[in-house]
Structures are given as C-alpha cells and as structure tokens.
Amino acid sequence: MNLNNNDFITIGNKDESDLIIIWFHGYGSNNWSFEPTLKVINMQMNEAAYIIMPNAPLVNDKRSWYPLPTKDENNQLLEDYQGLQASVHAIDNFIDGLNLDVDMKLIIGGFSQGAALALSMSFSSRHKICGCAALSGYMPCAKIYEKHDISVMDIFMSHGYEDKAIEYDAFQKSLKFLENKTDNIITSVGNFGHTINQQVVNDLASWFGQRIK
C-alpha cells in the first residue's frame, strides 16, 4: 500500500488527552467521512481522546486500504492475505512516524473496510493496542488468522440487520470467529443498514470511555 503518511486529520489535543484513537474510513470514502461523528463522540468523552484519521491511497480512483476480495471460477471468495499484511505494515510505519507517547493507550477502529483493517491489525500489528472498534465490518482472511493468537483482547463491534454492503451474516461469522479468540467483545446491533445510528454512537463513546479507566 502506497500510503501518504502526511495525509491525515486530527481531533482533540494530543498533549491533553488520555487516549489515542486511530480511525480508518470505509472503501471509496475518505478521512473526513467520520470526522463529524468522532467529534461528537469525543465531546461525549469530555475531549479525552486524540483522534487521528489517515486517508487510504487511491486505487482505481477509489480510496482502498487493501486489495478487495475477488471470486474464482467456482464463485469461491479469494482474499489477498499478502496484500492485507502489506497494508498492516504500512499502517504500523505510519504509527511510528506519529511519535506517540508509548505510555498512552492506543485504540484502532474503523468503518466497513476500515473496520476489517482494524480487526486484522488486532492480530498482526507490532504496536501495543488496547482495543479495536469495528463498525459494519468483517474479519478478513479468517482462515489464516485462525492459526494466529489475537493481541488485542478488547473489541467493540456494531452492525445493522439491514446491511446490504456487508451482510449481517458476515458479522455473525466474524463475531463467532473472534469469540474463540477473546471473551471481551461488546456488540451494538439494530435495525439499520450500512451505517451507524445514535445508539451505536452512544455505545461506542461509552466503550471508548471505559478504555481510559
């Protein structure tokens, strides 16, 4: 992944925060897409977080964190694990360049493809991460990660019953997979599509806040 390490936006005050959050947007979107929501969440947390939102590189005129899955001639899903790992490595290098306080708690999170990236980093990032928030996403390359230990034990997941982009069944399979890796999973689900609602916002803000304590 050819990531521009200077292309990111932030919320909050780095020097006055108790928590660092790195947030990954969805496929075809950009880092401004969740900025309003994350501002509201940080307000609910009394501005306790410093939030960093990088931009995925453009691939065929759409921003993408890693190679999208394809299907073979038998309609079987093909996932590019090496491409995904290259993206995780690029994000690790991005985090290195931020020169963050190593004593600060670090959370990763994202929406849709960004959520999938965050979940994969929960297994393979070289950084110490205390939590992962995955909204409307899925567990990529689960067959390979089945052989790996998870390093991030606290996970927040949300999904809508009516999601057509990443169907609820994919969430259920991902949740079942992750429950075999950790007992510390909080979920927030409801009657919505490939988006989030106010309940998810409130639940996520509460979960973030608990990571500070």
Question: Model-predicted segments: where are they?
Answer:
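Serine-hydrolase catalytic machinery in alpha/beta-hydrolase-like enzymes
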Residues: 2-104
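Short beta-strand immediately N-terminal to the catalytic nucleophile in serine-hydrolase-like folds
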Residues: 108-110, 135
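Gly/Ala-rich beta-loop-alpha elbow adjacent to hydrolase catalytic centers
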Residues: 110-114, 118
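C-terminal catalytic histidine-bearing segment of alpha/beta-hydrolase fold enzymes
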Residues: 156, 169-213
